[in-house]
């Protein structure tokens, strides 16, 4: 079925009598922030793909609400030789959705693939001398040096997730894309019901065996699926999505438009939940490979143009409690946040000086292509304010409005703008993704091996390596301050402030876990 046919069928369904309450209670109808563009949570850092990933795939460790790693697929962990050897034993009963058993060699291949793509994974693999399977149940790391953050790396909630998949899938080029989704998680992806642009469906995997003890907390603990189906129905228009939630045609709206939050808060049938307590840092990401932002002087000049309050007001408007200005390269909720170098963002704004600094840096009217995702209200607001800021600074701006899925695909292009490339895009992060240099994609500065935008700074990379080896929290904080100061010199991106978008559910929906949209534990009355 194509998208137009699906929407017509949906309209007909909305006019039909409701089906039996007992049957409806087994179906969770979810409105995602955007459509699912890609199925591979290892090769793609988009949050919508990560959310899909945690439904379908499982991880060796989970992460709880204190940000600590907890065994998930792993039953036992043993360290030997002063922390240079780690032996991870898989628990019994693990099966993939094709009903084949999860074996240690599947996990070894999955870790190796992820380790080539993820920032934290790259650090772990750089410290690893050998990764192997000892029989069907035991994964063995032999390290070059101690890496006490190994469980945290394998169990991180931040993109890119270390998803366990069959060896045949994990053999795929990590810079390619896997076109199927066969995991071992509590839900299986129903490819036959996929309608691009409109619908994604998951069914409870009857072969899933949850952990036998503990409490579900973020991605740790028993993952018990109480619903038979989870249906993601894309509704781009915020008023239509709001109406669907209010009428009971939808159960859960992932990201309500912030201007509708006050009215939703007054609805007795709706519950607003702070899903992510770490906030959403917003950024303007540069393409460091192409003019004009391959020039660090041009990037530095624009720091003086950023008015974080202006960006945040565009996103959240009157909902002042939902945003913060005066934030740097680490979220305000992180122990790594500091005031180091912050005068670059908090001093008096002077656009005349910005223009002079751009000219002194050598900006000569180069075309600047600004990608703006119009189907996500927060990113659309960031993009429009950012494009206007660049124009007021005297830059030659071309706004290219598109959907987020297209931005995700196009940002991979390293071509100049004349050949379909780009100069700037806007996004926001799950705050936990930026909590430390270990997981902070935006602060990786390893050139073309890094995240989209491809910042290249040996100094930032060296400081990150120092941080990974820091012996305690005070040492980590001191290094994080130095990293932030260096970031204000290299300017991998512009920090635009941070905001929080509550998630909205019907009151009869219970058991929603904090952290990110997770579908185990959720029940409908």
State the predicted function of each range.
Residues 198, 237-240, 256, 355-428, ...:
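Ligand/substrate-recognition segments at binding pockets and active sites
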Residues 210-263, 396:
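Ligand-site clamp/hinge motif
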Residues 89, 123-195:
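Surface-exposed binding/hinge segments that line
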Residues 187, 321-360, 376-381:
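Structural transition elements
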């Amino acid at each position: 079925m194509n998208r137009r046919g699906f929407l017509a069928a949906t309209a007909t369904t909305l006019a039909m009598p409701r089906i039996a309450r007992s049957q409806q209670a087994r179906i969770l109808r979810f409105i995602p922030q955007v459509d699912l563009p890609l199925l591979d949570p290892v090769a793609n850092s988009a949050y919508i793909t990560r959310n899909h990933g945690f439904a379908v795939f499982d991880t060796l460790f989970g992460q709880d609400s204190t940000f600590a790693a907890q065994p998930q697929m792993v039953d036992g962990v043993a360290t030997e030789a002063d922390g240079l050897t780690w032996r991870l034993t898989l628990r019994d009963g693990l099966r993939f959705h094709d009903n084949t058993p999860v074996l240690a060699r599947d996990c070894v291949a999955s870790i190796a693939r992820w380790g080539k793509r993820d920032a934290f994974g790259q650090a772990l693999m750089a410290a690893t001398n050998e990764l192997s399977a000892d029989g069907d149940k035991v994964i063995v790391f032999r390290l070059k040096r101690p890496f006490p953050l190994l469980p945290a790396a394998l169990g991180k909630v931040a993109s890119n997730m270390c998803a366990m998949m069959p060896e045949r899938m994990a053999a795929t080029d990590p810079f390619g894309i896997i076109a199927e989704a066969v995991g071992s998680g509590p839900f299986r992806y129903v490819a036959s019901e996929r309608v691009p642009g409109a619908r994604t469906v998951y069914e409870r995997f009857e072969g899933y065996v949850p952990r036998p003890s503990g409490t579900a907390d973020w991605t740790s603990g028993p993952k018990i699926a109480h619903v038979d189906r989870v249906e993601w129905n894309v509704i781009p228009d915020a008023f239509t999505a709001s109406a669907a939630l209010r009428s009971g045609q939808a159960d859960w709206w992932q990201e309500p438009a912030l201007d509708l939050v006050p009215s939703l808060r007054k609805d007795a049938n709706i519950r607003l939940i702070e899903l992510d307590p770490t906030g959403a840092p917003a950024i303007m990401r540069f393409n460091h490979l192409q003019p004009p932002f391959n020039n660090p002087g041009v990037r530095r000049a624009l720091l003086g143009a950023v008015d974080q309050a202006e960006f945040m007001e565009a996103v959240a408007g009157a909902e002042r409690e939902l945003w913060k200005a005066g934030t740097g390269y680490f979220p305000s909720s992180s122990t790594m946040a500091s005031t180091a170098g912050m005068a670059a963002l908090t001093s008096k704004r002077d656009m005349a000086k910005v223009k002079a600094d751009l000219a002194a840096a050598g900006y000569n009217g180069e075309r600047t292509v600004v990608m703006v995702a119009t189907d996500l209200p927060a990113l659309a607001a960031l993009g429009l304010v950012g494009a206007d800021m660049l124009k007021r600074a005297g830059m030659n701006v071309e706004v290219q409005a598109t959907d987020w899925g297209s931005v995700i695909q196009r940002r991979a292009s390293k071509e100049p703008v004349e050949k379909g490339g780009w100069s700037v895009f806007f996004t926001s992060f799950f705050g936990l993704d930026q909590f430390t240099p270990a997981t902070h994609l935006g602060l990786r500065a390893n050139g073309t091996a890094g995240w989209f935008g491809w910042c290249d700074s040996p100094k930032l990379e060296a400081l990150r390596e120092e941080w990974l080896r820091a012996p305690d929290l005070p040492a980590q904080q001191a290094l994080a301050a130095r990293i932030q100061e260096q970031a204000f010199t290299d300017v991998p991106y512009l920090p635009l402030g941070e905001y929080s978008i509550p998630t909205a559910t019907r009151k009869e929906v219970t058991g929603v876990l904090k952290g990110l949209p997770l579908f185990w534990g959720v029940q409908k009355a």
